[in-house]
Regions:
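Membrane-embedded alpha-helical bundles that constitute the cytochrome b-like, heme-associated redox core
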Residues: 1-215
Length: 215
């Protein structure tokens, strides 16, 4: 398998893990922690496959598109590191030896806030990379239909994002997650997938706007 294929498979699997982790109300705490630690190792593998970015981040041509993507990548990395740190400090099963590194109440507030920021930046990150794929797509009826469908899905996704109170989590207005723990896992994952798609589509639109602005 080529390195490019490995990267693509890793990206897809990471998106799946993120959706699964954000569906924590439908999983027990122990599976959530184990999946989180597994996701940490997958992210490390992802970083190894993309070491070139760290080596060339300062050398890459300084244009608005690359600068914006670098900002999103940096924000994504920072929010991920802080999400992991706060999560591990609350762990009871996966890494109990790290439990209590910081005050549990503080860790909970940080984790609730930062995981949602990470979710948003992950979506934007996906959207910027989707622009490269879109350049290979022909302006056909299927492509036009997909674009319209993406708008409709995204509008619904943002309504879900607001309806579930995720903005309050991002602004650290609440200390506890108010979730429906009776919702089936598949339904929770579909909801989170739609919301992630919405942010990815926004990332795609921003990237496309910057690209057209340059030309």
């Amino acid at each position: 398998m080529s390195k490019k294929s490995q990267k693509q498979l890793t990206d897809i699997f990471l998106a799946f893990l993120l959706i699964l982790l954000m569906s924590s109300q439908s999983t027990e705490q122990k599976p959530h922690e184990v999946i989180g630690v597994f996701a940490l190792f997958m992210v490390l593998a992802h970083q190894i496959l993309n070491l070139w970015w760290y080596k060339n981040a300062l050398k890459i041509q300084k244009n608005p598109l690359n600068l914006t993507l670098n900002f999103i990548n940096l924000a994504l990395i920072i929010s991920f590191i802080l999400s992991v740190f706060s999560g591990l400090s609350m762990s009871k099963y996966a890494t109990p030896f790290l439990n209590g590194i910081i005050k549990i109440s503080t860790a909970r507030e940080f984790h609730l806030c930062l995981t949602h920021w990470f979710f948003v930046f992950a979506g934007l990150h996906i959207g910027f990379h989707a622009l490269k794929l879109a350049t290979y797509a022909n302006k056909s009826k299927i492509a036009n239909f997909a674009f319209v469908a993406s708008w409709l899905i995204s509008i619904y996704g943002f309504w879900l994002f607001l309806d579930t109170g995720m903005v309050d989590y991002m602004l650290a207005k609440v200390q506890f997650a108010f979730l429906d723990f009776k919702i089936p896992l598949y339904q929770s994952m579909i909801i989170n997938a739609i919301m992630l798609f919405s942010w990815a589509f926004i990332g795609f639109l921003i990237a496309n706007f910057i690209k057209n602005l340059r030309s």
